[in-house]
């Protein structure tokens, strides 16, 4: 029996999600940024999804961003926070997601951010 222990990185796709996505993976696969008909249908689906997520979270659709994955999401969140709130110091650990460490490292190398690392021991 195989046991998968990396659900923090990638999880199995829920069958309900797969069924909802099949049309967009097979027939309606247009680029939502394109101006042609297939692209516009894809754009409509993305916007409908944005409104659905916003409604579930009691948020504005303008506050919902879809990204390609953790790296892009982490970069947007960190860069936005650092710039918007004029963050000059970040505290993290060496166990943090690689994308977070790379983004913080880049800001540190550019002299825009001091980064401190908490020590990790057997208790966390």
What is each residue range found by the language model?
Residues 1-124:
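Pyridoxal 5′-phosphate
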């Amino acid at each position: 029996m195989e046991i998968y222990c990396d659900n923090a990185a990638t999880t199995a796709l829920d069958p309900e999600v797969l069924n909802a996505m099949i049309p967009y993976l097979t027939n309606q696969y247009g680029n939502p940024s394109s101006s042609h008909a297939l692209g516009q249908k894809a754009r409509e689906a993305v916007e409908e999804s944005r409104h659905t997520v916003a409604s579930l979270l009691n948020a504005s659709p303008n506050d919902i961003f879809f990204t390609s994955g953790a790296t892009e999401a982490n970069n947007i969140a960190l860069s936005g926070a650092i710039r918007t709130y004029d963050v000059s110091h970040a505290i993290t650990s060496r166990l943090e997601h690689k994308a977070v460490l790379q983004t913080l490292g880049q800001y540190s190398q550019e002299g825009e951010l001091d980064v401190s690392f908490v020590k990790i021991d057997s208790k966390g």
